[in-house]
A protein has these predicted regions:
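Active-site/ligand-binding-proximal alpha/beta "capping" segment
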Residues: 162-204, 212-216
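Structured adenosyl-cofactor binding patch, chiefly the S-adenosyl-L-methionine
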Residues: 201-242
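Mobile, glycine- and charge-enriched loop segments
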Residues: 36, 61, 69, 73-78, ...
Length: 242
């Protein structure tokens, strides 16, 4: 069943925004009576069907509100700005896993900086990727993407979580399941993943001073995009609904 974002529902029906309507009509060639999943982008989903087509406008009849499928834990990933299009992959997979937010961070060993308008353009691109990923996986709430932030601002945000996890290649012994044993009720979790060059010792010191816990992801060093997805998957397995 194809998923679409809708405008505000009124009296059990809603219109598809122009871009969604074009996709439904021109690409998928849907017709009145075809079943769809309607999403408002704020967490609500409905089982629906195409109720009417008028030129390029599409009305969806909302038949039944579907159960909430958001994760029971709010997960934010702070990703040291990587090179190329790795953030695209991370945004897509975090959406599928149920992550709440992605916050790109300018860390000491980042090559990419993405400042000013470049940073805003990247945020908009990542939000679009997250929205499309949410449609594909049937998730009612797209991943929230922050504009690239400086280290000091990120550090302040990190300190606000119930639990802050730092996958680090130099961490020894402590695994995520060990942290879960001590903190099973954490519901607002942050993960900090370093860029290709890794996290500096000074950054580790500042994060641990703010309450962060260093953890190992095993004896092999993972790429930054792999570490982000693996960490999120483990958190969702332990604290979430995977």
């Amino acid at each position: 069943m194809h998923s679409f974002y809708i405008d505000s529902p009124i009296d059990g029906a809603a219109m598809l925004p122009p871009e969604e309507a074009r996709h439904a009509l021109k690409v998928l060639r849907l017709r009145p009576g075809d079943a769809v999943c309607a999403m408002d982008g704020a967490g609500r989903r409905w089982r629906g069907k195409i109720g009417g087509i008028d030129g390029g406008s599409v009305r969806v009849n909302l038949l039944e509100q579907l159960p909430d499928n958001e994760a029971p834990v709010r997960l934010t990933v702070y990703e040291g700005l990587p090179k190329a299009d790795k953030l695209d992959f991370i945004a897509q997979k975090l959406t599928e896993l149920g992550g709440a937010a992605l916050a790109p961070v300018r860390m000491a060993r980042c090559v990419a900086k993405l400042e000013g308008r470049d940073g805003e353009k990247r945020r908009e691109r990542l939000e679009k990727i997250a929205r499309e990923a949410a449609k594909q996986c049937g998730r009612g709430m797209p991943l929230r993407v922050a504009a690239p932030m400086d280290w000091r601002k990120a550090l302040e945000a990190m300190a606000a979580h119930d639990l802050l996890l730092i996958p680090w290649e130099a961490a020894e012994g402590t695994r995520l399941k060990d942290i879960f044993t001590l903190n099973p009720d954490a519901r607002d979790i942050g993960i900090v993943v370093g860029p290709e060059g890794g996290i500096t010792a000074d950054e580790i010191d500042e994060m641990t001073a703010a309450g962060g816990r260093c953890v190992t992801l095993g004896p092999r060093i993972l790429r930054t995009e792999t570490a982000a997805v693996v960490s999120a998957a483990l958190v969702m397995q332990l604290w979430g609904d995977v």
